[in-house]
Amino acid sequence: MAEKLDFLKRWLATAIAFLFWAVAGTLLQLGLLPFAKKGKQANLSTQLKIRHFVGGIWYYFIRYLSCAGALKVTYHGFEKLGRPGQLVVVNHPSLLDVVLILSKAPSLNCIVKKDLLHNPTMRNQILACGFIPNTESLDLLDHCERVLQQESLLLFPEGTRTGWDGIVKLNRGAVSIGLR
């Protein structure tokens, strides 16, 4: 009986979290529209302020999941992140990876899957924060090189979440960016 209650509690907490994500994402979509329209013309200072704002919302989202018992997270070494020129390469086993990382280190820039620009709750967050859509081109490498002169960059070398089979397929983008 206790297991069923625990499952129900976590299921309800997760359902509320998805509702929060949808509502917060929609509100951010509207609120960040003017900044998203500026796109690449927005200055770094504005992008950093928006990243900290979005990271703060994600921080409280993670806090809710932790307090509700749906998630347990321990962070180590995050104080070392955020220096210009730093390429942060991490694996991507779950949907929440980027949220977990950027809630604790919101100044990081990030290469994101370009398909997320079609997601109605993520598009304006991505554009307003100045995140870099993965176009898998030489222009992307040049853009990353420019970004790394002033910022640190978060990169998922798998390109997407790890499959259910646990097999990791690395894309060569991390190596290409690192070598530049």
What do the predicted segments below correspond to?
Residues 3-74, 124:
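A transmembrane-helix-recognition feature enriched in membrane-embedded lipid enzymes
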Residues 67-180:
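Soluble catalytic domains of membrane acyltransferases
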